[in-house]
Amino acid sequence: MLLTIIALKSCGNENNAPKFKIKANQKTFVSGDTLHLSIQNKNKTAYDSVQFSLRGARINPTYVFPEDALLGDIPTEAVVFIEGKEFRTTTNVRLLNIKAPSLYTYTLVNEYPHDKQAYTQGLEFDGERLYESTGLRGKSSLRRVNFKTGAVEKQIDLDGTYFGEGLTLINGKIIQLTWQENIGFIYDQESMAMKSSFTYEQSKEGWGLCNDGTVLYKSDGSAKIWTLDATTQKEVSYIEATTNKTIITKINELEWVNGAIYANTYQSQKDVVLIINPKNGAVDGIIDFDGLRSKVEQIEGLDVLNGIAYHPGRKTFFVTGKN
């Protein structure tokens, strides 16, 4: 099976340049599988040697995927050497989870009022205080909410140019994302006064956000969940949400619960929450919230399930949706 994106570097005429492709022995792999890489040489050009790498780390042409390998589409590169010149070609090798996710259902234990106009993007508890980020340009806000009554205790409205997205609380600060504006905001948690901002790097959009007490986890609408330094907000690495069959895209709102990332998926065919291993991206579980949407008032503009807030004291999840 050929998985190929060609990127060549040469000094001569590109039409006459050697054309190489990376060939893998399988379409997909799981941990423990053996990867065999070789070069397909379209022009049958003689070459001196070839060097392979996965995620920038050099490997032998025969490589066994370790148990703790990062899942998803692995950037793979070959450097072909011909008479002192280098020719590069890249592709992705897909590594899937070795086991299927566990399936869970839910028990509804209570209902609370919620602003029907709130286009909820982020939701997180600190004790009994519920913090919420809402979206849509001209309607985006940061809120502190009394979850029992639904009353908004304090609200900071964003400038109309911004589309609010996920939020998280860490070290006395609130960090809030925007969607396509390439900027995140940092607030003092108690006063909710804005203190500073930061710009995105490789992740061009802001979707969901959570933290484990040390680092931040940020989704960007793809399958990727980025790890960010909590102090500088710089991107460090990423994982990809991956099952035993596929890579799941449109990862949205995030919540950190007992060592795992719980995630909504935007515009999914089903109202589900994924349970993701933050170490390698494995989707270890899926919570099916089927039927939950029918239990709320069927207002005009009722949108998708979004917003997960875990209450550690009650050991329950508070979930809502956009509008």
Regions found by a protein language model. Name each.
Residues L8-S10:
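C-terminal motif of bacterial Sec signal peptides marking the signal peptidase cleavage site
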Residues T107-P113, A151-D157, A193-T199, S237-T246, ...:
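A short beta-strand motif characteristic of beta-propeller blades
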Residues G150-Y187, M192-S203:
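Blade-loop segments of beta-propeller domains
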Residues K116-G127, G160-N171, E201-G213, T246-G259, ...:
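Beta-rich, blade/repeat-based domains predominating
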Residues E132-R137, Q176-E181, K218-S222, A263-S268, ...:
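Conserved beta-strand positions in repeat-built beta-propeller and related beta-rich domains
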Residues F65-D73:
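Surface-exposed, short loops/turns at beta-strand junctions within beta-sandwich domains
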Residues V145-G150, D188-M192, A230-Q233, N277-G281:
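Short loop/turn segments that connect beta-strands within beta-propeller blades
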Residues L96-Q117, F147-E153:
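A short helix->beta-strand "capping" segment at the edge of beta-propeller domains
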